[in-house]
Amino acid sequence: MSKFSESTLSGWTKPASVTEEDRIENTISMIKSAIKNDNNFDNLVYEVFVQGSYGNNTNVRTNSDIDVNIMLTSTFYSKYPEGKTNSDYGFTDGTITYNEYKNLILTALTNKFGTGNVTVGNKSIKITSNSYRVEADCIPSLLYRNYEYENSSSPNNYIEGIKYFASDNTSVVNYPKVHINNGIEKNNQTHKNYKRLVRVIKRLRNKMTAENHFTNENITSFLIECLIWNVPNNYINDYDTWDETIKQTLIFIKSSINDNSYKNWTEVSGMFYLFHNNRKWTSDDVSSFVNSLWSFMEY
């Protein structure tokens, strides 16, 4: 048995407070209003949605920021099967560049929130918080249609992702909606316990950090969500207490690293390997985290 009571662990499985939800919803509403009321967007088709911990319903911090994607869909990027081009799908060149679109968003947000409350970061446009709203990272992106993944020849059959460019001109492609949908599916398969387990592990990480038991910035909330995503459902479903569920989850992760099966793990989207392509985290980071959490729990 760990040093934490079952009631404490159960409490840590819950999402952020209701009052925080109100500030988050205010922020989202204001961002949508900023874009909708700007005439520059009248002839553009776009979608505003939340991604990250709040979008995935795994947020735990009472003063957390949110990630808001402002995705242009009337002009988009595509990835085609080998030998295919725009013309095979009946597409023509887009009417706006990424930088032009990003600048329109920056102007709209600045007009809404004020110059002093909006700054441009490397990958997002940041909006400051106040008593009414939370801090927001707004990501201007273009729809990314991946036809290659399923070797699709139909213009309407693709994996939906996003593409954007950081300020250092690095291109970024990811699949936040696939991530959200896959997380919902696993949560349903585990009687809602997948996201509860993610939240309790996040809170334990935060507590370890606050108490100087473990500090590693590479153990991100995104990584924790992905690690638990790769834990088989029976490890999440089959135990009667959160204490035992956490213990068995740590055993599985550690065993998978020891036998190298972790190399086949993917992000929640299933579109990228979790430990390939020079990721900021390594298996050594995760091993250290698991060992520290094991000792922190006093197993």
UniProtKB/Swiss-Prot annotation:
UniProt GO MF annotations: metal ion binding; nucleotide binding; nucleotidyltransferase activity
Keyword Aminoacyl-tRNA synthetase included in the entry's annotation: no
Catalytic activity: 2 UTP = 2',3'-c-di-UMP + 2 diphosphate; UTP + CTP = cyclic CMP-UMP + 2 diphosphate
Cofactor note: Binds 2 Mg(2+) ions per subunit; only 1 is seen in the crystal structures.
Stored InterPro entries: NT_2-5OAS_ClassI-CCAase, NT_sf
Positions bound to Mg(2+): D67
Major enzyme class: transferase
CDD domains: NT_2-5OAS_ClassI-CCAase
Stretch forming the signal peptide: none
Keyword RNA-binding among UniProt keywords: no
UniProt keywords, alphabetically: Antiviral defense, Magnesium, Metal-binding, Nucleotide metabolism, Nucleotide-binding, Nucleotidyltransferase, Transferase
Entry's family note: Belongs to the CD-NTase family. E02 subfamily.
Domain comment (free text): The (R/Q)xW motif controls pyrimidine nucleotide specificity in the donor pocket, while conserved Asn-174 is important for recognition of uracil in the acceptor pocket.
Protein name: Cyclic dipyrimidine nucleotide synthase CdnE
Gene of this entry: cdnE
